[in-house]
Design a protein with these regions (language model features):
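Intrinsically disordered, low-complexity regulatory regions in eukaryotic proteins
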Residues: 1-88, 92-149
Length: 149
């Protein structure tokens, strides 16, 4: 027996088009938030790199201002300007000399740039698909309104 392929009810088609539109809209929002987070990460990495580079010219110990939160700072003395402690992930902290720490930051910056580029491409793709879904939704909605008259 051959199956009878009846067209989908119009309200179901409209609902599917709206779901597709909503999905792409949500993905755009998520990707935008992730790009914003990556931008802040890149800024923090740049600041850390700049600070480490300035430490390279220091000798012995140095007076520094340390942020302790909520726009509050404390004066402190940096006992060792040749080595720093670097979080390498998973709660693991290792001692590195300043040039090695700078290389680590540069590698992280490249990784952030690569992820940002991939995310920007996805964002562009989602935007195009959302635009197509929106056009289809408007077109189909207008078609249904025309039938109601």
């Amino acid at each position: 027996m051959a199956k009878n392929h009846e067209p989908k009810p119009e309200n179901l088609v409209l609902q599917e088009k709206y779901i597709a539109y909503s999905y792409y809209k949500q993905q755009i929002q998520v990707a935008s938030e992730e790009l914003s987070t990556l931008s802040m990460t890149k800024h923090a990495l740049g600041f850390a790199k700049e600070t480490l580079e300035s430490m390279g010219s220091m000798k012995g110990s140095a007076d520094v201002i340390v942020p302790i939160g909520a726009q509050v700072f404390a004066k402190a003395k940096l006992a060792d300007v040749k080595d720093v402690l670097v979080n390498i992930g998973g709660g693991v902290i290792v001692k590195k000399d300043v040039p090695a720490a700078i290389k680590s930051i540069e590698a992280e910056e490249k990784e952030v740039d690569n992820i940002s580029a991939q995310l920007a491409a996805k964002l562009k793709d989602f935007s195009e698909k959302m635009g197509e879904a929106e056009a289809e939704l408007e077109q189909y909605s207008a078609k249904l309104k025309g039938k109601e008259k």
